[in-house]
Structures are given as structure tokens and as C-alpha cells.
Amino acid sequence: MSHLNIANLGEDFVAQWLQSTGWMILNRQFSCRWGEIDIIAQHTRNNQESILAFVEVKTRSPGNWDDGGRGAITLKKQAKIERTARIFLAKYPDKAEYICRFDVAIVSYQIISKQDHELSITQESVTSSSVGEYKFQLQEYIPAAFECLID
């Protein structure tokens, strides 16, 4: 399976996890000339205050070289995500008053054997999922992972 397909499966997994925790997915792979945001999600608190999360998903196999994807969230990448978020808010001005934050989801995946796949179905939790021959696990979800400069 290609890197792009693995990345998309990782994003699918995180979107499902967010929905299971009360978030509504507003957009997936929102892109403009500045970059792309993997997931844009909204959560409304009990007091009706809405949070808008711009989520960067990093899906990595064991033994990767960039600390599970954390090393790929450079200042340059953060600036691209922020510029893309500004474009999203300009396109959807009704969301501009929401509390905005930039989250990062670290997902690991591995190829599983048929025997392991059968076991994972019965032991699966909300933070792990199997798709075909791959098992995905949410290693870490970092809310407000980097500074939000959106007004």
C-alpha cells in the first residue's frame, strides 16, 4: 500500500475517533495554495461555546526517524497550517468567532498477521482499529499542540 493510502487511512481513523468523542467533522483535506489541513472539526461545549480544531495527523510505522511524526511539525509546517486555517475561516466566516486551536494526532500502524487480526477484533478499543492487514493506534492526541495566532 502506498504512503498516501496509509496516511488517508490514518486520517480516517482519527476522524472516526474524534466523532466518537463528540466532535463533528466539518472538512477533510481542506487545501489551498498555502497547504492542506487534514481534519477540521468542531466541538460545542455544554455552555454552547464552540471550539474549532485544525488537526494535523501524522501516521507512522514503528522504527520511524521523526519521533512518530512529531519531528515533521516544523515551524514552517505550522505556518502553512495557520495560513490555510485563515483561508478556511475567510471562506466560512460564521466559524471565525469560534475558539480556534491547532491539534496534532500521532498514529502508529503496523502490518498484522491473520492470527493477530482475529484477536484484534475482539480486543479492539476506541483508540485502535484494524483495516485490512493494518492495525492503527492513536499514540497521542495533542490539543493546542502549537501556538494559535488566529484572532
From Swiss-Prot:
Signal peptide: none annotated. This is UPF0102 protein Ava_4800. The lineage of its organism: Bacteria, Bacillati, Cyanobacteriota, Cyanophyceae, Nostocales. GO terms for molecular function: nucleic acid binding. Pfam families: UPF0102. HAMAP family: UPF0102 (MF_00048). Belongs to the UPF0102 family. InterPro entries: Restrct_endonuc-II-like, tRNA_endonuc-like_dom_sf, UPF0102_YraN-like.
